[in-house]
A protein has these predicted regions:
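Conserved donor-binding/catalytic core segment of Leloir-type glycosyltransferases
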Residues: 239-258, 264-268
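Short N-terminal targeting/anchoring amphipathic segment
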Residues: 92-113, 128-134
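Carbohydrate-associated surface elements
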Residues: 198, 219
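Membrane-proximal helix-turn-helix segments that form the acceptor-binding/catalytic region
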Residues: 124, 152-192, 205-208, 212
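A short, charged, and often flexible helix/loop element on the N-terminal side
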Residues: 56-89, 107, 164-173
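Active-site proximal beta-strand in glycosyltransferases
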Residues: 102-104, 120-164, 191-193
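A short helix/loop element that forms part of the nucleotide-sugar donor recognition site in Leloir-type
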Residues: 178, 226-239
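N-terminal subdomain of nucleotide-sugar transferases
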Residues: 1-57, 96-98, 124-127, 265-271
Length: 282
């Protein structure tokens, strides 16, 4: 909660994300919203996609048909984060009415908002921003995960992932979009938060390296996830006592981003050893 305080004052906080209450970041945003209000602060959530939530202080500004058009235009033009004019106006209007002391941004990709007018408005009003980076999108030309590519350190272009999400069918606009992001973010009053040291290190390799960067790990529900007796767990999972255990945790683990292929390769290398692979969330 310290991030939301300023000169001893409990700030009025607006959280912005693609989702609310659903998906990984949407759940995080809703939990923050609930915690902030229970701590005696004023809080609101603006989100762009998903079902409309009928709770006070939660506003869906995204227009579904416009999101679909945005996704189509991205595929045709190679540009993303620069359409959805009507949805973006609704978001800016809400900010005008709510008058937050601080804005906490999470994800702004996924075809639901126009970055330029939104970020220029926030800078014009001099609203401090805490921005949690859950991926690499805001300092690359387009990539949520750049893998081994370090093109974002210079100017992007010749993108090896141009056909990946956010997908372009024809044009590589990554050099142009990275230039836009540098223009929008370089002079912004911005505190970046990452959920891992790895991502913080990647941010420090980018044009945002001089911004304040903090690592705050994602929280867990300790009533569900907590230490248990290892022997009891082995018995429950039918793992022999003399077997080693390799644990892999990820949703959709066989997707390229989650690295499931490395688990399979490791399993093949260790197939003759006394080892058990345990996959969680796969």
């Amino acid at each position: 909660m310290e991030l939301y305080d300023q000169d001893g004052k409990k700030n009025r906080v607006l959280l912005i994300d693609v989702n609310c209450k659903h998906s990984s970041t949407g759940k995080i945003v809703y939990e923050l919203f609930d915690r902030i209000r229970r701590d005696g602060r004023s809080a609101a959530v603006c989100y762009g996609r998903g079902e409309r939530i009928k709770e006070q202080g939660i506003y869906k500004f995204g227009i579904d048909w416009e999101t679909n058009v945005h996704a189509l235009l991205t595929r045709i033009t190679g540009l993303n984060g620069c359409f959805s004019a009507f949805s973006t106006r609704r978001l800016i209007r809400y900010i005008e009415e709510y008058q937050p002391d601080m804005i906490h941004i999470h994800e702004l990709h996924a075809y639901f908002v126009n970055l330029k007018p939104l970020l220029r408005y926030i800078k014009k009003k001099r609203i401090p921003v805490v921005w949690t980076f859950h991926c690499e999108y805001m300092y690359t030309g387009k990539c949520g995960h750049a893998y081994e590519c370090l093109g974002f350190q210079k100017s992007c272009g010749n993108c090896p992932s141009v056909h990946d999400y956010p997908k372009s069918l024809f044009l590589d606009q990554t050099k142009r979009m990275l230039h836009w992001k540098k223009e929008l973010l370089s002079d912004m009053d911005l505190h970046i938060v990452t959920p891992s040291k790895w991502l913080a290190n990647r941010v420090q390799m980018s044009f945002l390296k001089d911004k304040q960067i903090s690592v705050i790990h994602n929280g867990i529900d300790t009533s569900v996830f907590h230490p248990v007796d290892a022997c009891d767990l082995r018995e429950q999972l039918n793992i022999p006592k003399d077997y080693k255990v390799v644990l892999a945790i990820a949703p959709d683990i066989m997707s390229e981003q989650k690295g499931g292929k490395w688990v399979l390769q490791l399993a093949e290398l260790m197939k003759d050893e006394k080892v058990m692979f345990v996959l969680v969330g796969a």
